Structures are given as structure tokens and as C-alpha cells.
A protein has these predicted regions:
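Small-residue-enriched, tightly packed secondary-structure blocks
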Residues: 27-229
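Bacterial N-terminal signal peptides that target proteins for export
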Residues: 1-12
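Sec/Tat signal peptide C-region and signal peptidase I cleavage site
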Residues: 20-26
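Hydrophobic alpha-helical targeting segments used for export or membrane insertion
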Residues: 11-20
Length: 229
């Protein structure tokens, strides 16, 4: 009798454990999808904030020349991506059919130079050359090695021409622009976020170059409206 009761308890516990594990697995994709959607919303808000800042005159004057924008709403010191500093980013870029995206990326390195006392910053990287855009279509991009980078000019009437770099990067922390060194930073496609957002396996080439991935334009519209208008 005791043995049967014990076996029954074990069976109930095992069944409950399997059910909880199944629920956790089911919840993970849903959470990742929600995280990807939130990242798109946050990226739109980040771009809008940078765009409206009167000191970022260069950004507004050169938007038409840009091949794309890689936006990271939050880069965290000692982040989760590469063990140093890291965060997620989205790319909206010009493809053969016009503006495409978003494509999702991880950005991080052990050596991004944060200012003293800074632990979080936001980043808008302006893709200025075809080489820069092509490098984002690869499996991994290292700033400074695979593509050149320059800090974005800040101030009205300053540095509005003459920058020769594949990426012009604006960073902001504690309300101030600049101060971060992105030489050596690594950018990689985020396969899990791309899959979660589009509900299928896809690459930045599928999303940006081929424009072959159907997606919810309504969800993307705030980000697209800010960049493609």
C-alpha cells in the first residue's frame, strides 16, 4: 500500500515537472518575440531622440547619404553578449527595393571604452558606405578591422563634411554624446531574435538585400516612419 502511494506521488511529481518544463519551453519563444518587438519600439524612440537633438546637425544633413542605421537602445557595461559590454541592435537599411528591416544584431566587446562612471549608453551607428552595409551582411563584423569607424560630430555647424568612414557612430550616456571608443567592437546577426520576430529562420541578407521576409508593417511603422520618411 505504501509502495503504491509512493509510486503515485513520484508519478505526479514527474508529470508536474514535465508540464512545467514544457510550459517554460513554450514561454521562451513568446518572451523572445516580445523582447524583439520591444527592441524595435525602443530603437524607434532612440532614433527619434537623436534626430530631434539640435546638436546632431550632421546626422540630419547626411541622412539621405546613409546606407542604413544600426540602432542599439541599450549597451550595457559588463553585458551578456561577449562578457564585456554588450546589447542588442536593429538595422534598417536601403535594399534594392527601398528601405528594409529591421534585422537584429548583437553588439559587444570586452574593450568598448566607457567613460568613467558610465554603465549604460545608447548608440546610433550611421552606415555611410556600401562596404559598411556589406560587412553587416556577414556572420561577424569587427569595427576598425573589417570597417572603419568615426565618432559622429556634435554641435551646430561643426564637422558637417569631410568624414571618411564606413560607420559614423553616435553614442550617448548620462545625457552627453561621445566618449566611447568602438574600435574592436564586434557586431553579429542575432539569429534567435530574427527568428522570433519573423517566425522563421532568416538572415540579414533575406531581410535587407532580398526583402523576401514578410512581416508586420504595422509593428514596424514607428521605426520606419522615423527613418524612411
Amino acid at each position: 500500500m505504501m509502495k503504491r502511494a509512493f509510486r503515485g506521488i513520484v508519478l505526479v511529481l514527474v508529470t508536474a515537472g514535465l508540464a512545467l518544463a514544457g510550459s517554460a519551453r513554450a514561454a521562451d519563444p513568446e518572451k523572445k518575440t516580445a523582447d524583439a518587438q520591444k527592441l524595435v519600439v525602443d530603437a524607434g524612440a532612440t532614433f527619434d531622440e537623436f534626430w530631434k537633438d539640435r546638436d546632431l546637425e550632421w546626422l540630419r544633413k547626411h541622412k539621405a547619404d546613409a546606407k542604413g542605421f544600426l540602432i542599439a537602445p541599450e549597451i550595457v557595461k559588463a553585458g551578456f553578449v561577449f562578457g564585456g559590454s554588450g546589447g542588442r541592435a536593429v538595422l534598417v537599411a536601403k535594399g534594392p527595393k527601398g528601405w528594409e528591416g529591421p534585422a537584429f544584431y548583437s553588439m559587444g566587446t570586452a574593450s568598448v571604452g566607457f567613460q568613467a562612471g558610465v554603465s549604460v549608453m545608447t548608440v546610433v551607428a550611421v552606415v555611410m558606405t556600401q562596404k559598411g552595409l556589406d560587412s553587416l551582411m556577414s556572420s561577424s563584423l569587427k569595427f576598425g578591422a573589417d570597417a572603419s569607424v568615426a565618432a559622429g560630430p556634435v554641435g551646430v555647424g561643426t564637422g558637417v563634411s569631410g568624414i571618411k568612414a564606413d560607420f559614423v557612430i553616435y553614442s550617448k550616456a548620462k545625457g552627453l554624446y561621445g566618449g566611447a571608443n568602438f574600435e574592436g567592437a564586434v557586431v553579429k546577426p542575432s539569429e534567435d531574435f530574427n527568428k522570433a520576430y519573423y517566425s522563421q529562420d532568416c538572415t540579414p541578407i533575406d531581410i535587407i538585400v532580398k526583402g523576401s521576409v514578410p512581416h508586420n508593417k504595422a509593428a514596424d511603422s514607428p521605426l520606419f516612419w522615423r527613418i524612411a520618411k
